[in-house]
Regions:
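Aromatic-lined carbohydrate-recognition surfaces of secreted/lumenal glycan-active proteins
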Residues: 183-188, 216-217, 253, 257-270, ...
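Secondary-structure transition/capping motifs at alpha-helix termini
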Residues: 205-212, 244-260, 285, 322-330, ...
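Aromatic-lined carbohydrate-binding/catalytic grooves of carbohydrate-active enzymes
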Residues: 177-347
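Alpha-amylase-like alpha-glycosidases and glucanotransferases acting on alpha-linked glucans and related
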Residues: 286-329, 363-404, 465-485
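Catalytic and substrate-binding clefts that recognize carbohydrates or anionic sugar/phosphate headgroups
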Residues: 1-180, 188-190, 201-206, 519-521, ...
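Generic beta-strand/beta-sheet core signal
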Residues: 212-219, 238, 260-264, 285, ...
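Catalytic core of carbohydrate-active enzymes
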Residues: 368-378, 386-399, 422-432, 437-604
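Catalytic nucleotidyl-transfer cores of nucleotide-processing enzymes
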Residues: 252, 397-413, 500
Length: 604
């Protein structure tokens, strides 16, 4: 470690040097904050130390699942898989042993972002692609170490968290958006081919579900593996499962139901599109010159080279615009992006430098494809991986793969801190899979978990379920024992549409749709709930996150509140316990909200 000394300074410029290392720094007021440009004389690991405010909380760093406040922790700046095998094994095969929930230091993230917001209402953002570690373990300093010197740092401050968020959005635009139809009810995952999809859609409509859309991720085919039913990674309609694709999508549209699909930047080995791309040099290579294959559970796949212009054009024009949007698809999951190997060979660029940027490149390609299509304004896609700048391109993010349980490290509760931290990083519109995704052996979702998750996501920007990796052994929203709850809660989401649209307008300014309890007051000292949230400014939600619970104890933010579905008046700032029968969300609205009349009209 070589400390750099100040060797030259002027009004807005400084130079630091020692031995052969030199960094020139210039400062400029822009975007309502301070841009600090860093120009090193080479590539070298850099450590930046900033004074900390005693007692402050630190939020952000991208999608951090285990807790909101990162003070006392380290955050790794490296895009990675969130889900790992050992916790699943402990919960299932070794379930006779007590399960100890994992700490923050154990848990990776699909979406690290080098933006950090303090409870003192300032934020630091670094423009950097390299691996790094943000160290908040010291009381007197925040220490940022990167494998290469950041290109710049950005400092934002304000008199409220919303003001800081707006300044961050001025520096990196928040271009999140959802078509209005997304808020007309619930998007329910249904797989298995058009006959089954249509049957389930008809059943749900008959049962009173406000069905905004159906999401059929196996539209391109199904691959049954050792872990469950997976998608066949060949991005064109499977004519066996989904025959007469255009006509059947139109038939759903006539019922008022949208159709959603799935894509990722990989192609199953020896599939038709894999062979097409391999022949044209569109797949990423290994150092020996062959195609670099990754293994997904039990099958191999090639990776589309997103640095190769011909491959990018093929993804946009053929896979997205022709094969999906041109055939009536209204939205889709743009999965993955976190797996670029650092030892591969790309058409252009260093994979080690592009690893963190890969999810943003993937989101950018999808956004450009959607916006260049005549139906672009009616279509959205959702991503799970991200990095700095993802908010410029992804229309909405989801929290990735959660376990189908109530554990706070990988289960339903973890999506709340994860969403808060994304919001403090600049990503303002996030949702989760209703019911979770990870299911293995005895790890399967109960009817109770599904309904509690549905209660929560009725109060979110996007209400969408997942069938899990094992649809046949997990309770689904259309199952007879829960469909009445699905119907009631989908109606709640649809009734909130005018308010949710307002929340999405604010998200375009950088203000998160879902916020922690202290966001509006700005007083972090009054923070009591990592597992409750403000939806916009005027709604407070306290999901039930414990199996078997029939009540929820929570402290509401200061002010006068009214409980949804009962009209009980509640004074904020004090801890209280509320009954929570299954299917009845613990949710409140401000008594003086301009939307109070709307909220009072919402019924289960």
């Amino acid at each position: 470690r070589v400390p750099l000394a100040l060797v030259r300074a002027s009004a807005n410029e400084a130079e630091f040097a020692a031995r052969d290392y030199r960094v020139r720094m210039t400062a400029e007021e822009r975007f309502g904050g301070l841009v600090i440009r860093l120009e090193p004389n080479g590539k070298f690991m850099t450590e930046l130390v900033f004074a900390a405010v005693p007692g402050e909380g630190i939020f952000g760093g991208g999608e951090q699942y285990r807790q909101l406040d990162m003070k006392g922790e380290k955050i790794v700046n490296f895009v990675s898989e969130h889900i790992v095998v050992p916790p699943i094994v402990r919960k299932t095969i070794l379930k006779f042993l007590p399960y100890k929930e994992k700490p923050h230091s154990y848990i990776g993230t699909y979406s690290p972002m080098s933006t950090y917001t303090s409870s003192e209402k300032y934020a630091l953002r670094f423009d950097v692609s390299a691996y790094g570690v943000a160290d908040f373990t010291r009381g007197d300093a925040s220490v940022f170490r990167f494998a290469e010197c950041p290109r710049s740092a950005f400092y934002a401050a304000g008199d409220s968290f919303a003001a800081v968020a707006k300044t961050l959005a001025a520096e990196t635009p928040s271009n999140v958006r959802l078509p209005e139809w997304c808020m007309d009810g619930m998007i329910v995952a249904v797989q298995g081919g058009f006959p089954r999809v249509t049957e389930k859609a008809d059943e749900m409509l008959k049962n009173g579900v406000k069905l905004a859309g159906v999401w059929s991720q196996d539209w391109s085919g199904r691959k049954v593996t050792a872990v469950g039913k997976q998608v066949y990674w060949n991005w064109e309609a499977d004519e066996t499962l989904y025959p007469d694709f255009d006509e059947n999508v139109r038939a759903l549209h006539e019922k008022g139901v949208k159709f959603l699909a799935y894509i990722n930047p990989y192609l199953v080995k020896d599939g038709r599109l894999y062979n097409y791309c391999a022949e044209r040099g569109m797949l990423i290579r290994n150092r020996e010159g062959g195609i670099y294959h990754i293994k997904s559970t039990t099958f191999d796949a090639g990776m589309i080279d997103l640095t190769y212009p011909a491959a990018v054009e093929f993804v946009k024009e053929t896979l997205i615009k022709r094969n999906m949007l041109g055939r009536g698809v209204d939205g889709y999951m743009a999965d993955f992006g976190e797996y670029l190997p650092v030892d591969c060979v790309l058409h252009a660029g260093d994979p080690a430098e592009l690893h963190n940027e890969w999810p943003v490149i993937w989101a950018k390609i999808n956004r450009e494809a959607v916006e260049s299509h005549p139906r672009g304004g009616e279509v959205f896609f959702f991503t799970r991986s991200g990095y700095n700048g993802a908010e410029k391109y992804s229309t909405v993010m989801w929290n990735g793969d959660q376990h189908t349980d109530f554990t706070r490290d990988y289960g339903m509760p973890c999506v709340m801190p994860a969403t808060f931290n994304l919001g403090f990083s600049g990503y303002a519109a996030v949702h989760s899979d209703v019911g979770g995704f990870i299911s293995f052996a005895s790890l399967a979702r109960s009817a109770e978990l599904l309904v509690r998750w549905t209660e929560m996501n009725a109060f979110s920007p996007l209400m969408r379920s997942h069938e899990t990796i094992r649809p046949d052994v997990n309770v689904q929203p259309y199952d007879e024992r829960v469909v009445a709850h699905t119907a009631a809660l989908s109606r709640v989401h649809a009734a909130l549409k005018p308010y949710l649209m307002r929340c999405m307008e604010q998200a375009r300014e950088g203000i998160p749709v879902m916020r922690p309890d202290f966001y509006e007051s700005g007083d972090y000292a009054k923070h009591t709930e990592d597992y409750a949230y403000l939806l916009g400014s005027d709604v407070f939600v306290a999901p039930v996150i414990t199996a078997g619970a029939a009540e929820r104890t929570v402290t509401l933010p200061e002010g006068d509140w009214v409980r949804f579905f009962g009209g009980e008046r509640v004074r904020g700032g004090q801890r209280a316990t509320f009954p929570a029968p299954l299917g009845t969300p613990v949710a409140f609205y401000r008594a003086d909200s301009p939307f109070a009349e709307l909220f009072a009209s919402v019924r289960l």
